[in-house]
């Protein structure tokens, strides 16, 4: 079965959220619970790329996010779902060549509709708009 990237992003969000609560969570088991995979079917490569990429670049992304927050705000004040959405968007903005920055931002805003609220949408749009620079080449 082929999954649309939007669905893969949602599963990546859910996986990363679970990993915040339990860093030892079994990712493969989570994928099986969140995606209707046939027994022989493999986890979509893009899902693995997102989850691994966000995890590997988390410190870099958190530093960028913190630098974009209003005076007096720290990363600890950002709600966990919003932080994960920001990290996912930053990964796509900086490391996924075939996802334009505008698309990464739009997809983050769509995810916010599903996993957060309207106030958070404005916050995420502001942070990503502030950061939205050129992509970094992948290793």
From Swiss-Prot:
Gene Ontology BP terms: DNA-templated transcription termination; transcription antitermination
Record-linked SUPFAM superfamilies: NusB-like
Example of a GO MF term: RNA binding
Protein name: Transcription antitermination protein NusB
Protein's UniProt keywords contain Disulfide bond: no
Record keywords, A-Z: RNA-binding, Transcription, Transcription antitermination, Transcription regulation
Higher taxonomy: Bacteria, Bacillati, Bacillota, Bacilli, Lactobacillales
Main function: Involved in transcription antitermination. Required for transcription of ribosomal RNA (rRNA) genes. Binds specifically to the boxA antiterminator sequence of the ribosomal RNA (rrn) operons.
InterPro entries attached to this UniProt entry: NusB-like_sf (IPR035926), NusB_fam (IPR011605), NusB_RsmB_TIM44 (IPR006027)
Record organism: Limosilactobacillus fermentum (strain NBRC 3956 / LMG 18251)
GO CC entries: cytosol
Transcription listed as a keyword: yes
Family per record: Belongs to the NusB family.
């Amino acid at each position: 079965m082929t999954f649309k990237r939007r669905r893969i992003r949602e599963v990546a969000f859910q996986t990363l959220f679970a990993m915040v609560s339990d860093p030892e969570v079994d990712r493969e088991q989570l994928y099986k619970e969140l995606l209707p995979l046939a027994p022989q079917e493999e986890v979509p490569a893009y899902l693995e790329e997102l989850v691994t990429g966000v995890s590997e670049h988390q410190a870099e992304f958190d530093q960028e996010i913190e630098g974009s927050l209003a005076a007096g705000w720290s990363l600890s004040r950002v709600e966990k779902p919003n932080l994960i959405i920001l990290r996912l968007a930053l990964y796509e903005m900086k490391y996924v060549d075939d996802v334009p920055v505008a698309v990464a931002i739009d997809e983050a805003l769509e995810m916010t509709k599903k996993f957060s609220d309207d106030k958070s949408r404005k916050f995420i749009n502001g942070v990503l708009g502030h950061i939205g620079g050129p992509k970094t080449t992948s290793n």
